[in-house]
Amino acid sequence: HCKNLKVIGVLRGGMENVNVSYAESKGIKVFNTPGRNADSVADFTLGMILSEARNIAKGHLGLKNGEWIRTYPNSATIPDMPGRTVGLVGYGEIGRKVEKRLQGFETNVLVYDPYMKGEPVYGKKVDLDTLLKESDFVSLHARLTSENAKMIGARELSLMKPTAYFINTSRAGLVDESALYDALKSKKITGAALDVFEHEPPGIDYPLVTLPNVTITPHMAGGSQDAFFNTPKKLAKRMMDAGI
């Protein structure tokens, strides 16, 4: 119906909401904005790691409720960051920015990405099982596809250290939430920090929300003001670079 349409601009990295092949068959160029909120998500990921491992959000909530909480689910194993190993599942722009930021914390970095070419800038490229077994923090940064849906399930979680933390600021569909709930409930892993859920908003009775060893946020990792204002600029630059 849009006979004069020449260009479609997508203000996000993924183009799942556009039939790209059909558009291109009609001579319509499609542009997206990969990495539009990469800094925002990378910053937030580091915040989630620290918040869950050091009980920042839990301590804050306790004081707000008039409680002086000194004991937490991970009190016996609270870690410092130097010398710890962070495993990054996915090495797109967000994963690379998280890796760079982690250098300031003197951590070791492992990277798994089946589509990755070459080696990580700072970390070490490994297979997924090795990453899960050796990491103190496992952080997801992969795009959700039909091939990797629920790539983290009961088997994968069972490979993680009992002192490890699971971080997801990416997509809920990458994880089997029932398996994650079981792993956290049974303390097969120490904790998790989650910004995304299979059903949003999850509600106070949502299984993962009810657990004491989870830091939760309402899908806000990419929501910085800088990301909001920079996205149209990134899209415009991509179009201009293509001669539009």
State where each predicted segment sits.
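Short loop/helix-cap segments at secondary-structure boundaries that form the rim of catalytic
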Residues: 1, 18-25, 115-122, 202-210
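An N-terminal-biased, well-structured beta-alpha scaffold segment characteristic
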Residues: 1-31, 133, 153-155, 159
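Short, well-ordered alpha-helix to beta-strand connector turns
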Residues: 2-5, 106, 135, 163-164, ...
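Short beta->alpha connector loops at strand-helix junctions that form conserved
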Residues: 11-12, 28-39, 170, 219
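Rossmann-like dinucleotide-binding domain for NAD(H)/NADP(H)
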Residues: 30, 163-244
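Phosphate-binding beta-alpha-beta segment of Rossmann-like dinucleotide-binding domains, i.e.
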Residues: 34-85
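Rossmann-like dinucleotide/phosphate-binding beta-alpha-beta segment
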Residues: 74-162
